[in-house]
A protein has these predicted regions:
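Gly/Pro-rich hinge or "lid" segments in bacterial periplasmic/extracellular proteins
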Residues: 72, 89-103, 192-265, 270-277, ...
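Surface-exposed binding/hinge segments that line
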Residues: 125, 159-207, 226-234, 379-393
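Extracellular/periplasmic solute-recognition and catalytic clefts
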Residues: 166-168, 231-242, 267-331, 338-342, ...
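N-terminal lobe/hinge region of extracytoplasmic solute-binding protein
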Residues: 29-118, 148, 152, 223
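Detector for C-terminal structural segments
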Residues: 8, 15-19, 69-71, 234-239, ...
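Aromatic- and charge-enriched surface segment that lines or borders ligand/interaction sites
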Residues: 55, 59, 80, 84-85, ...
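Ligand-site clamp/hinge motif
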Residues: 127, 216, 247-300, 341, ...
Length: 619
């Protein structure tokens, strides 16, 4: 007579319940918890590392750094969809990124992490010593509450965390996240990036007895846990942060040599020209220059000549995403790809680069410029494996021609490109009609083709105006509208525009965020980053191929495939990029001999140099 499983357990002297518990214990013992997570298991630093290579372990603590910020703020809660938020809270996450690796995170609030090979779940062990600024311990309950609270508070988090099925406490200092899908390599990293919020604070009451609500704006400084805490807030004007002397994570390897300034201040300006004048007047210390004109002509003031201000180009190993004129394809006028293509033919980048930008820029031709993920030449065999099943839904040129932008380097080419644009508009049903003495593009219903460029900085008008002239030569009516930042944010969050300056930033390891940039669900969700309104099942499938890539080669192939599909659909009019940061600073700071590969590292790994500061003051 064969023995049943229950009989075997009895012979072993164990009850079924005890045996199951023993199996669970054995499984737990088989789990190899690690100190770090990486997208493809290529972790640089070992478990016993002492510090990151790009820091100065002997960096002095002290001094201050001041930043200028364009805009204003009426809210200090960074987790809600509402209001204009100021930087006043610093909440640690379970993990923190290394600045010299593409996609690796090391333990911060979490001391160790484990996931199975199929990435169906991830388990974190929390550090018992982790604390909020009020001294209360960071617990598993805080982690679990944070995930749901963030989902409720902001559409981005709700989308970003949508494949997290549940979070639950699995030990005294342990949290388990279970996922609704297997094979999504980025999901463990996404959970590691989540800021851990203090449940007791957000569910409590303020000093006036009012119930706090993470879904709403507030000017009360939220409780944090990081290395800095807000010390002074002047609504709409400035925020002063001070380093927490007894910060719980000071001695962790990920903290050594970082956060060296005693004070960080953010000073707000409503006008970019006023902000630059404030920098010249030593009202703040550090500036990343976004204006080619100012970079070429503006840094000739006395402090530069006296070497009090240093300008420097800092090259980075980073992906240059797509900055563009983003066309809102939710609107009928942009539904036909030929209209969108015509607008690219009308944009004279070469004239703008020579006459406005001092020749500093390279024309963007990819959503992954300056990286191995940029599509070049014709599709490879690996790319075709993704593309062929979708061939009937794709532009045929994608398979036969490398994507390039029209070039307007001569008067002849400008005329040629305008003729091509006119032919494309004709083919799309927008033909020229004389009306009130003007040549206008109209459709079959007699509606004129009109475009509004929505801007929030006057500096963009100098770029839009020459483009307007080219478009008007085609019979298109153009209105350039510059609004204040608050109105701009309201309109862009609800996609109330024809054309805006769009930016699709990319990391070295694209993943789940591509759904928010290009996914169909995001196209209909207010506040998403899908500014164009792309709702294409082909794009959705390729985005999934990115997310579920099994190795780096597969990820690169899927990104190149997405690049081809996006560019050949002409969703945007590409602008330009530069492969370095243009920086200017008052010369009061020291830095490591080698900066991290993927970040300028300011102010994280820089420090106050008292000797330099004294020299600047003496000049």
């Amino acid at each position: 007579m064969p023995l049943s499983r229950r009989s075997l357990l009895k012979l072993a002297g164990l009850s079924p319940l005890a045996k199951i518990a023993g199996i669970q214990m054995a499984l737990a013992e088989d789990r190899e918890f690690k100190h770090a997570l990486s997208l493809f298991d290529d972790v640089k630093y070992p478990a016993d590392f002492k510090h990151f290579d790009y820091v100065n372990v002997d960096a002095p603590k002290g001094g201050r750094v001041r930043f200028g910020v364009l805009g204003s703020f009426d809210n200090l809660n960074p987790y809600t969809f509402k209001g204009e938020t100021g930087q006043a809270v610093n909440n640690d996450a379970l993990l923190t990124s290394s600045l010299d690796e593409a996609s690796t995170e090391y333990g911060l609030v979490a001391s160790a992490v484990w996931h199975p090979d199929d990435r169906s779940m991830v388990i974190y062990r929390l550090r018992p010593e982790a604390r909020f600024h009020d001294g209360k311990a960071i617990t598993a309950e805080d982690v679990i509450w944070s995930m749901q609270a963030l989902r409720d508070a902001h559409p981005f988090y709700n989308s970003y965390y949508k494949n997290i099925a549940k979070a639950e406490q699995s030990g005294d200092h342990e949290v388990t996240f279970s996922f609704s899908q297997t094979g999504n390599r980025e999901l463990p990293l996404i959970t590691g990036q989540m800021p851990v919020l203090p449940k007791h604070w957000w569910t409590g009451k303020d000093d006036k007895g009012r119930q706090r609500n993470i879904n709403e704006t507030t000017l009360e400084v939220p409780l944090g846990s990081g290395s800095y805490v807000a010390a002074e807030v002047k609504p709409g004007v400035s925020i002063k942060m001070k380093r927490v002397a007894g910060y719980w994570g000071n001695d962790l390897p990920v903290s050594v040599g970082t956060d060296n300034f005693d004070e960080i201040q953010y000073i707000y300006f409503r006008d970019s020209n006023v902000m630059f004048e404030a920098f010249k007047g030593d009202q703040f210390d550090w500036r990343i220059e976004s204006s080619s004109k100012i970079w070429a002509t503006g840094y000739d003031f006395p402090a530069v000549k006296k070497n009090q201000v240093v300008t420097e180009k800092i090259a980075l190993k980073q992906v240059e995403g797509m900055q563009c004129w983003a066309l809102n394809v939710r609107r009928g006028k942009f539904k036909d790809a030929r209209v969108r293509q015509a607008l690219n033919h009308a944009f004279d980048f070469e004239w703008s680069n020579a006459n406005l930008f001092y020749g500093q820029y390279t024309r963007s031709r990819s959503y992954f410029n300056n990286s191995e993920m940029e599509a070049k030449g014709l599709p490879t065999a690996e790319e075709l494996a993704l593309l062929e099943p979708l061939r009937g839904q794709l532009p045929p040129e994608l398979f036969t021609t490398e994507f390039t932008n029209p070039v307007n380097d001569t008067p002849q080419n400008r005329r040629k490109n305008l003729r091509t644009a006119s032919q494309l508009l004709d083919a799309a049903g927008w033909t020229v009609m004389q009306r009130d003495g003007k040549s206008l593009r109209v459709n079959g219903q007699g509606e004129a083709l009109s475009l509004e460029f929505l801007l929030y900085e006057p500096i963009w008008e100098r770029v839009a105006l020459p483009y307007q002239q080219q478009l008007e030569l085609l019979g298109i009516t153009v209105n350039i509208k510059t609004v204040d930042l608050s109105q701009y944010e309201r309109r862009t969050q609800t996609f109330d525009y024809d054309i805006i300056v769009g930016s699709f930033g990319q990391s070295l390891s694209p993943g789940n965020e591509q759904r928010d940039l290009f996914g169909s669900e995001a196209a209909g969700r207010n506040g998403s980053r899908n500014s164009v309104g792309i709702a294409d099942p082909v794009v959705d499938k390729i985005v999934d191929a990115i997310i579920f890539s099994k190795d780096r080669k597969g990820l690169v192939t899927a990104c190149r495939t997405l690049d081809r599909v996006l560019t050949w659909n002409h969703f945007v009019v590409p602008m330009w990029f530069i492969p370095y940061e243009r920086t200017a600073r008052w010369d009061r700071f020291g830095r490591p001999g080698k900066l991290p590969d993927y970040s300028v590292g300011f102010p994280t790994v820089w420090w106050w140099d008292a000797e330099k500061a004294a020299k600047v003051a003496a000049k």
